[in-house]
Amino acid sequence: MRGNVYLLWGATTTGKTAFSVSVAKERGWSVIALDRFQGYHEISTGSGAPTNNELEKTERIYITPQRGLADGIITAKDYNYWLKSRVLSLPEGKSDFIIEGGSVSLLKEMVSDEFWADFLWEIKIFRAPSKDVFIKRAKRRITDMLHPEDGRPSIMDEVSSFFMNHKTIHPLEDIDGYRTIIDYCRCKKIGFDKLKIMTTDQEKIIISGIAEEYYAHALWQEQETPCFPHSWSRRW
């Protein structure tokens, strides 16, 4: 048995990150993000990566290759490979950790890999609340992405900067949140380098659109969550 893993699984806005910080502080464990996007600095705001203040001095590890987002998003297969390498490199006495996230593709890759059977698992699943509650929470979070108070660029700034630096918005259009912004700009013929001129009403439309996108994705995540294999020893 290699060590203990506490998996915190669920959709966005369900409280996983805050809970992971609480557990990390209590147990002294690191948190590994089960997310293919949060490790890219170009999209730290819109991907939902927690701020340093939110992490409260706990360690959060991102499994991201040493390349930029323009070179493509890490695949689930590659993520699993690098995650295993990272776990095997943990120092003796620090082999217990938390995995927190909601990526279906990553979890499916892990449950099909016998490597992960050699751990003692504790699993907590965060269910999406009612649609009204979810949308309210999501809108609050998206508003913070549009107007961050921690010095980070807004999600709009991230779209503009990526477009101006690379003359493309791929692969942003494949990511929740960014997809809604890009589709809206195309529909309204707004240049990706002109997002600072968005009106309050336009922002409200985008916020509502992203919230609905998040909710639809949350329902899909719950439907597509793979079964945990019997080979995973677990404590519930």
Swiss-Prot record:
<dbReference type="Pfam" id="PF01745">
    <property type="entry name" value="IPT"/>
</dbReference>
<dbReference type="GO" id="GO:0009691">
    <property type="term" value="P:cytokinin biosynthetic process"/>
</dbReference>
<dbReference type="InterPro" id="IPR027417">
    <property type="entry name" value="P-loop_NTPase"/>
</dbReference>
<protein>
    <recommendedName>
        <fullName>Adenylate dimethylallyltransferase</fullName>
        <ecNumber>2.5.1.27</ecNumber>
    </recommendedName>
</protein>
<comment type="similarity">
    <text>Belongs to the isopentenyl transferase family.</text>
</comment>
<dbReference type="InterPro" id="IPR002648">
    <property type="entry name" value="Tzs"/>
</dbReference>
<comment type="function">
    <text>Transfers dimethylallyl groups to AMP as part of the biosynthesis of cytokinin phytohormones.</text>
</comment>
<keyword id="KW-0203">Cytokinin biosynthesis</keyword>
<keyword id="KW-0808">Transferase</keyword>
<dbReference type="GO" id="GO:0009824">
    <property type="term" value="F:AMP dimethylallyltransferase activity"/>
</dbReference>
